[in-house]
Amino acid sequence: IGSEIHLVKVDDPYYNESKNLPEVKKVMETLKSQILDDPTKTILIASTNRAQAGLIQDELDRLRNKDKVINDYISSHKGELDKLLVMNLETVQGEERDIVIISTVYGPDANGVVANRFGDLVRSGGERRLNVLLTRAKEKVYLVTSLNSGDIRVSPGAVTGKRYLKDYLSFAETGIISDTLVRESGEPENDFERAIMNAIKQRGYEVDAQIGCLNYRIDLAIKDPRDTSRY
C-alpha cells in the first residue's frame, strides 16, 4: 500500500437520508488535527456520495468563519494544486493531495441498524470509482467511518464497490489485505497509457490497466494467452 491508512471511528453515528452529520463533525476534527500537525500538507476531503460532500462543504464554510486555524490554512492554500478540496465519488478523478480524508458516510440509523444499501457503490463501475477515490493520497489516508467491515454483507465471489469497501475497511482494521484489493484493475491514468493499451489490443492481446493494490500498481498488464487468469 503506498499511503498510510489511519482508521478514524465515529462516536454515536447516525445515517439518515444519504447523510451522516456525526461523521461530518469527525471529518472536521480530523482536518483541524492534521492542519495543526503539519499545515504545509495539501488536503482533499472526499465522500462516497454527493449529499455528504455538500454537507461537508457547508460545515467547512461555517467553520472557516469562526475557526482561525481552518481559515488560515484555506487562505494560505489557494493554488490549483494545493487548495483544500471537497469532492465525492463521481468528481474526484484526476485530483491528488498529500493527505486525503475520506467519509464513508453509511452507518446505523436511529434504531442502530445498518441497512445493506450503499448507493452508487453498488451500481455498475462502483468498484472502479471507489478505487479512484481510495488512491488520491500521496502520503496518508484518514478513513473516517461509522462502519465495521462486518456491517457490509456481500455475495460470495461478488466484485462490486460494496465488496471493495468491505475489504478496504477490513484492511484498515486488521492490516490483512484481500485478493479483491490485490487484483483489482482500473482505467488508464492518461492518454499515453490509453494509446499504448489500444496498440497492444490491436495486436490481439488482452490487457488490463492499473493492476495491483491501491497506490502500488502496474500501469498495464498483458494477459497470458494460454491462461487469462495470469499476466
Where are these regions (language model features)?
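Conserved helicase/translocase motor-coupling segment
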Residues: 1-61
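Generic beta-strand/beta-sheet core signal
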Residues: 8-10, 46-48, 87-89, 102-105, ...
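Helicase C-terminal subdomain and adjacent C-terminal extension
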Residues: 60, 64, 111-214, 219-221
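Conserved motor-coupling elements within RecA-like helicase/translocase cores
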Residues: 69-100
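A short beta-strand element within the Helicase C-terminal
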Residues: 95-107, 112-115, 141-142
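Active-site beta-strand-loop-beta-strand hairpin of nuclease catalytic cores
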Residues: 221-231
